């Protein structure tokens, strides 16, 4: 309300075209843009292997992708904005969510959604440590969290779910939804990423949710092999396909292009993510920081 929300502040001085766009495309699903990118899997594989053998560091492909996202946002904060009630807001955090199995050995034990906040000065190792800690916390037996209790509660009475969801939508529309609710739900993050390759599925372009304010969805797919010509010789090259879905209303095409160019650069040269950025750019009146993460227990390979 009055330009402030628990998760952001309304942007002032918007370009007229950007300002009218949410009125032309009022719903997030109206403004979805679907992109495809194939990362060089051989580069990523060699980098992960070197990290393990030379430094004893355990790094995953997903962690590299998330670290690339965080670093690209640190120089292009415009892509981290979101639209609510046809108004443009600067997000006051850099966050990501993804779904994991509570027990990878037993799919019947259900899933858990992991939601993590990052600092824009995070290195690849910081991102890895935050992700490992969050995954470990969600894979141990623990009482139901706030979100699970809330969902179970609203289904206790017939018809209550419809009323409760409508009420939350109304509160969210005017920026007065409780911060504890936004923190618990995975629909209030900058990026949602899914590794469907772990399910033996090809890459997907996942839809954006009209609920909440997720502005980007990334789907990691199964390895692909394609013929390429290098130095006059043809060979089969390995690629990691990524399906990317974005909300075109949050910033200009030029900002998105610069952001995606940075992502491609970091996926081609992941070693650039090992050190903090030289400079961090915050959006309009939205500077934020997160404490340094603790070292993940499983991050270092045992000697």
Task: Walk through the language-model features, giving the residues of each.
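C-terminal catalytic/motor cores of large multi-domain enzyme assemblies
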Residues: 1-303
């Amino acid at each position: 309300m009055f330009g402030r929300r628990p998760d952001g502040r309304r942007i002032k001085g918007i370009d007229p075209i950007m300002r009218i766009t949410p009125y032309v495309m009022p719903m997030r699903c109206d403004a979805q843009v679907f992109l495809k990118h194939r990362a060089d899997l051989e580069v990523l594989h060699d980098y992960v292997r070197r990290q393990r053998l030379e430094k004893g560091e355990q790094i995953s492909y997903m962690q590299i992708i998330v670290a690339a996202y965080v670093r690209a946002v640190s120089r292009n904060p415009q892509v981290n904005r979101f639209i609510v009630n046809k108004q443009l807001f600067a997000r006051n955090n850099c966050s990501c969510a993804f779904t994991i199995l509570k027990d990878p050995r037993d799919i019947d034990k259900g899933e858990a959604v992991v939601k993590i906040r990052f600092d824009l000065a995070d290195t690849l190792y910081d991102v890895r440590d935050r992700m490992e800690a969050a995954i470990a916390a969600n894979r141990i037996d623990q009482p139901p969290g706030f979100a699970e209790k809330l969902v179970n509660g609203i289904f206790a009475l017939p018809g209550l779910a419809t009323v409760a969801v409508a009420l939350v939508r109304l509160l969210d529309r005017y920026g007065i939804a409780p911060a504890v609710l936004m923190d618990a739900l995975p629909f209030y993050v900058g990026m949602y990423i899914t590794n469907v390759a772990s399910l033996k599925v090809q890459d997907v372009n996942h839809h954006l949710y009209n609920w909440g304010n997720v502005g980007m969805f990334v789907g990691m797919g199964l390895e692909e092999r394609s013929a390429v010509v290098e130095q006059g010789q043809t060979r089969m090259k390995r690629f990691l396909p990524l399906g990317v879905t974005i909300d075109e209303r949050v910033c200009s095409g030029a900002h998105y292009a610069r952001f995606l160019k940075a992502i491609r650069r970091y996926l081609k040269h992941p070693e650039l993510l090992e050190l903090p950025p030289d400079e961090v750019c915050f959006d309009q009146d939205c500077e934020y920081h997160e404490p340094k993460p603790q070292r993940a227990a499983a991050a270092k390979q045992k000697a």
